[in-house]
Amino acid sequence: MSRSVLAVGARPGDLENGCAGTLAAHRAAGDSVTMLVLSCDGADDPGTRRAEAAARALDCLLVWGPEAAERRRRPERRTQGRGTGDRRVRRGQPGESWDGAAIAAIENVLTGVDADVIYVHAPDDPDTERRAAAAATLSAARHSARILHYPGESAARFDPTLFVDITAHLDRKLAVVADPELATATARHLGARARVRYAEAFVPERFVWDVAGTR
């Protein structure tokens, strides 16, 4: 039985670092995977282009959140701040832009792809934007049965209890991350904890196991 997977990231690069190996494993198993990225710095930004290339490499559908979509449609707005005379590059504060509209957008994607597995940042991630992404996703996915949190750049407060063996898919992860050496070391460390060679790790927000299912 194939599954529909939704992975949510605050910014380009988050999903690649946090769970690209697992997404590759899902695709290898025949699951459909949608990568939803909530923010970016415009269509011409290198991070945006890398995210698009990563989605192609992982054979996943990439969807931009409302803020990211607006920035990609109107790249000239990247240099215009929200205050009079302020022309610095500025991403809106999470509280400004990731409100009910963002929650509704996430819920629309979730419903549209009929996702039954959701990956998102940890709600206590040190980065405020990632915490906001987690909060918005948890609100949108309040009726979902399987929600897993992946680690951010700092795993100091991240205590995983669920591991995915990505040994067969590590090369695909390394092809899309900015620091392959760090990604390899992290996957090896997590693999040692999981008693496999390479792994990614997650903290379940909620995980209902369908024992009667084929997977």
Language model features: what each stretch is:
Residues G21, G42, D124, E153, ...:
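Flexible, active-site-proximal loop/turn residues at the rims of small-molecule/cofactor binding pockets
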Residues M1-D114, R142, V203, V211:
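Active-site rim/loop-helix segments in enzyme catalytic domains that contact anionic ligands
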Residues A105-S154:
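Active-site adenylate/phosphate-handling loop in enzymes that bind or generate adenylated species
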Residues N17-G18, D45, T128-R130, D159:
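Short glycine-/acidic-enriched loop or helix-start segments at secondary-structure transitions
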Residues L58, P75-G83, S144-R215:
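The feature marks non-catalytic terminal segments
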Residues G21-L23, T48-R50, A132-A135, T161-V164:
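Short, glycine/charged-enriched secondary-structure capping and boundary segments
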Residues T48-A51, I103, A133-A134, L170, ...:
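A general structural signal for well-ordered alpha-helical segments in protein cores
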Residues G95-E96, P123-D127, F163:
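Short, surface-exposed loop/turn motifs that are enriched in glycine and acidic residues
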